[in-house]
């Protein structure tokens, strides 16, 4: 049973456990600040392969992450819709949102970002949810026998996040402009696949990150238009009661989504 009382002590335990696993016997002076300890832990967790972990590790990790992740939670019930009763735009950290599901912009290997301390959404979601998500994703890939295709959607538990589930989708990667019709359609398919999966599992609400607009380089304005158009068409054509949150992080994306929703209303 997990008995460590502070998150700093938990971080030190997890760091030492992962270093032992790597046969890292170099002398390490533990950082004194929580922030530096977190960065060390996060980097090790990011690069750790999808291998089994001990019950003790999980207990310590879950106690720490659950505590940290529930300190600053935004509940969907506290948000006001921007259009109708079921479309929301919210600026903030998607990993703090209490909701049925959040959408993760994954890569085709489907194991989460394995670059230490990288600030992509895939890295942040996996880090804050816990190692179990990587293990679940690895099992999905093992069962299907191939990398994840662009435009599909798979569901895992949210584990230590306020969100109950994570829906993972691989968006198109843009290598040249203008964006091709094929890649526009693939991005729309990402949103459609996530919406269908949410309804298939009787979820009440889902929050989308800005799929493909980070390192995958989809232009933000085009992506916002496609996201809004696809979601609104789906809700109208299926009569779905699903509540949809467009989660944005930057001021630019916030403005783009507001403009896209206003244009669609004209």
Swiss-Prot record:
Broad class of enzyme this protein falls into: hydrolase
Consequence the record notes for mutating residue 113 to A: Loss of hydrolase activity with GcvH-L as substrate. Loss of zinc binding
Positions of Zn(2+) binding: 113, 118, 120
Catalytic activity: 4-O-(ADP-D-ribosyl)-L-aspartyl-[protein] + H2O = L-aspartyl-[protein] + ADP-D-ribose + H(+)
A Pfam family assignment: Macro
Stated consequence of mutating residue 118 to Y: Loss of hydrolase activity with GcvH-L as substrate. Loss of zinc binding
Phenotype when changing residue 123 to T: Loss of hydrolase activity with GcvH-L as substrate. Does not affect zinc binding
SMART domains xrefs: A1pp
Alphabetical list of CDD domains matching this protein: Macro_OAADPr_deacetylase
Binding site for ADP-D-ribose: 93-94, 107, 120-122, 212-214, 216
Co-factor binding comment: Binds 1 Zn(2+) ion per subunit.
Example GO BP: protein de-ADP-ribosylation
One MF term in the entry's GO annotations: hydrolase activity, hydrolyzing O-glycosyl compounds
Keywords: Glycosidase, Hydrolase, Metal-binding, Zinc
Annotated InterPro entries: Macro_dom, Macro_dom-like
Cofactor: Zn(2+)
Domain Macro: 74-265
Documented EC number(s): 3.2.1.-
Recorded domain comment: Contains an N-terminal three-helix bundle motif with the Zn(2+) binding site.
Task of the protein: ADP-ribosylhydrolase that specifically reverses the SirTM-mediated mono-ADP-ribosylation at an asparatate residue of GcvH-L (SAV0324), by releasing ADP-ribose from the target protein. May play a role in the regulation of the response to host-induced oxidative stress.
Family per record: Belongs to the MacroD-type family. Zn-Macro subfamily.
Oligomer and partners: Monomer. Directly interacts with the lipoylated form of GcvH-L.
Protein name as catalogued: Protein-ADP-ribose hydrolase
Species of origin: Staphylococcus aureus (strain Mu50 / ATCC 700699)
């Amino acid at each position: 049973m997990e008995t460590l009382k502070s998150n700093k002590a938990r971080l030190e335990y997890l760091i030492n456990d992962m270093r032992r696993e790597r046969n890292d016997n170099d002398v390490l002076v533990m950082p004194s600040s929580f922030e530096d300890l977190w960065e060390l832990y996060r980097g090790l967790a990011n690069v750790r392969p999808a291998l089994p972990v001990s019950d003790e590790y999980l207990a310590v990790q879950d106690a720490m992450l659950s505590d940290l992740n529930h300190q600053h939670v935004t509940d969907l019930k506290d948000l006001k819709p921007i259009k109708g009763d079921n479309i929301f735009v919210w600026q903030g950290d998607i990993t703090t949102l209490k909701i049925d599901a959040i959408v993760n912009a994954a890569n085709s290997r489907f194991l989460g970002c394995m670059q230490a301390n990288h600030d992509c959404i895939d890295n942040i979601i996996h880090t804050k949810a816990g190692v179990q998500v990587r293990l679940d994703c690895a099992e999905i890939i093992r069962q299907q026998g191939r990398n994840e295709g662009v435009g599909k959607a798979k569901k895992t538990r949210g584990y230590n996040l306020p969100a109950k589930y994570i829906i993972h989708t691989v968006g198109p990667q843009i290598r040249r402009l203008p964006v091709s019709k094929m890649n526009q359609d693939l991005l729309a398919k990402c949103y459609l696949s996530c919406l269908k999966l949410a309804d298939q599992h009787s979820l009440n609400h889902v929050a989308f990150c800005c799929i493909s607009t980070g390192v995958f380089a989809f232009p933000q304005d085009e992506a916002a238009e496609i996201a809004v158009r696809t979601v609104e068409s789906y809700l109208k054509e299926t009569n779905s009661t699903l509540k949809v949150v467009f989660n944005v992080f930057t001021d630019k994306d916030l403005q783009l989504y507001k403009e896209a929703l206003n244009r669609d209303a004209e």
